[in-house]
Structure formats: C-alpha cells, structure tokens
C-alpha cells in the first residue's frame, strides 16, 4: 500500500515537472530559433533583391554577432557593386569618347587621300592635301598615345614603383627637355621655389608636369611667360604652372580636367593638343593621393596646380622607397 502511494506521489510530482520542462523547452527553443529564423528570412529576401536592414535586436548574443557579420558583408557587397557600376560607366564613356575623337582625324585622312586620286589635281593642292594627311596622322598618333596612357593610369591607379622624388629637380629637367618646343614658341620659362620631397613614381610625375608646361605653352603669345612655382603648403608639395595667356574665362575649372573637354571646339586641335593632357594630370595626381586645381590669374593668364602629400621630414630613406 505504501509502495502504491509512493508511486502515485511520484507521478503527481513528475507529471507537472515534465510539463514545465516541456514548456520551458518550447520557450527556449523558440527564443533560440526565432532570431536565426528572422536572419534567414532577411538573408533570403536580400538574395532576391530586397533592401533589407541587418540590425541586431538584442534578443540573442550569438545571433546579434551573426547579424553584425551579415551587415558588414552586405555593406561590402554594395560598395563593390557601386564601384563596379562606376567602372563600367567610365569604360562606356571612354569608348564613346574614343570613337568620337578618332572619327575626326580618320575622316580628314580619308577625305584628303581621296582628293589625291584626282589625276587633274594641281600640284599646289597636292602638297596641301599631303600636309593635311601628315598632320592628321601625327595627331592620330598623339591621340592614341594619350589614350593608352590615360587608360593605363586609370586601370592601375597605384604607381608600380614609389620612391622619394625631388619636384624642383624634376620640374627643371622637364623644362630642359622641352626647351626646343618652348624656344620654338618663344616662351620665357622660369622655375622657382622649393617643395618638400614626395613619395611617387618619377615617370608619372614627370608626365604630369610636362603636360602642364606644354598646356601653358600652347596658349601664350610669342614672347609670353611661363613660371613653374614650387612650394610646400599644408603638408602638400605643390607645383603651380602659371602663364600670361588668355586664361579660360568663366568655365568651371573642374571641367578643364575632364577627358576631351574644350572651351572652344577648335581650340585644342588648333594648338596641337589631344584634349587628354589635363585628364592625364588629374589621374596621375589622384594616383598619388593628390589633387589638381585651375584658376584664372587676376593679372591675366591661368594657373594649373598639382598638390601631392609631402614626405614628413622625420621619415628615413629606408621607409620611403616602396615597391
């Protein structure tokens, strides 16, 4: 009898406990699975294209950590998609610009070549058409070279070899190398000032300064002046190329560094440029974490500047050179 009563008592105790344990198991299981289930639903919705916010709700530490990881992954993916879209748009614009710019010299070459087939063409016109073909061929060669240079810089924005560069020495070398061209255009050129050394690719920086000096030489009058000024400003080494030409009027200075931008439809072709020189300067500056700027001078003429972060004075030579 006592054994039977003990069994009944055990059942009366175990049954409620079992019910409580079962209910607690369901509650805990729901507490554990619901955050994971919500995260799974958000992930599925995001995979289908929905813009779902991934924010931790504090219900479960592990789920919150996983949510934060997913949030970072989503942000990284969105940034990569954005960067890819920008790159694709630039490629489309580049191809469109190339097609447009190549059409002009090719049309001129073909048209004048067809005129040369005329057996009754006077000798004077024959020489004229030949000169046009030669000039347009040279322009086409320069354009192709600049296109390849710009594309190389934009596709590989970080210079392959970075080393200490003395901009004053580099600017002087550029002016010396351009002496025949500057002399032909009767340009009076002066290099002045000093700037702290920078960490950069010497060939790329030489190209940038060359383009700025050549650009200035195209828009000065015979006997005009070009000044290459160097200075250290707010932690940057600045190269400013000034001329006493006609300036660029009311044009937005930022537009001057766009590919193929011209303030005058015939201006660049008439001066032998390709419309890519300043765009190359901008790309080189940005590849060195630098900036470009253009402004009209109060006394007349224009100033084009490139600013590159200076090497701090306390940095040793061993820490400067990088490949």
Residue ranges and their predicted role:
Residues 248-262:
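Short conserved segment of the HATPase_c
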Residues 216-217:
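Short helix-loop "hinge" at the ATP-lid/N-box region of the Bergerat-fold HATPase_c
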Residues 155-160, 193, 197-201:
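Conserved micro-motifs of the catalytic ATP-binding
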Residues 181-190:
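Short conserved segments within the C-terminal catalytic ATPase subdomain
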Residues 286-323:
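C-terminal end segment of the histidine kinase catalytic
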Residues 2-95, 110-118, 122, 152, ...:
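Membrane-proximal HAMP signal-relay module
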Residues 60, 161-176:
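A conserved beta-strand-to-alpha-helix junction within the catalytic ATP-binding
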Residues 135-140:
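Short alpha-helical segment of the dimerization/phosphotransfer core of two-component systems
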């Amino acid at each position: 009898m006592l054994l039977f009563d003990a069994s009944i008592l055990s059942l009366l105790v175990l049954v409620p406990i079992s019910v409580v344990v079962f209910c607690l198991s369901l509650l805990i299981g729901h507490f554990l699975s619901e955050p994971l289930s919500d995260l799974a639903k958000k992930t599925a919705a995001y995979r289908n294209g929905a813009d779902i916010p991934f924010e931790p709700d504090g219900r479960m530490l592990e789920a919150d950590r996983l949510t934060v990881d997913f949030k970072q992954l989503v942000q990284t993916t969105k940034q990569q998609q954005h960067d890819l879209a920008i790159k694709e748009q630039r490629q489309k614009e580049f191809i469109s610009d190339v097609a447009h710019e190549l059409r002009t010299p090719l049309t001129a070459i073909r048209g004048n070549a067809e005129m040369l087939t005329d057996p009754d063409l006077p000798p004077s016109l024959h020489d004229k058409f030949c000169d046009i073909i030669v000039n347009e061929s040279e322009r086409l060669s320069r354009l192709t070279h600049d296109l390849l240079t710009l594309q190389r810089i934009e596709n590989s924005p970080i210079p392959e070899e970075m080393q200490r560069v003395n901009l004053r020495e580099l600017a002087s070398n550029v002016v010396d190398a351009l002496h025949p061209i500057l002399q032909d255009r009767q340009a009076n050129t002066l290099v002045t000032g000093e700037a702290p050394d920078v960490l950069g690719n010497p060939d790329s920086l030489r190209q940038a300064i060359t383009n700025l000096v050549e650009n200035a030489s195209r828009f000065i009058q015979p006997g005009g002046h070009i000044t290459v000024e160097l200075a250290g400003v707010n932690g940057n080494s600045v190269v400013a190329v000034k001329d006493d030409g006609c300036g660029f009027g009311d044009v937005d200075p930022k537009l001057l560094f766009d590919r193929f931008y011209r303030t005058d439809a015939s201006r660049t072709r008439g001066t032998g440029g390709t419309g890519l020189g300043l765009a190359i300067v901008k790309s080189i500056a940005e590849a060195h974490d630098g900036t470009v700027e253009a402004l009209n001078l109060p006394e007349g003429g224009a100033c084009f500047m490139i600013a590159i972060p200076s090497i701090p004075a306390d940095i040793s030579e061993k820490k400067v050179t990088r490949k």
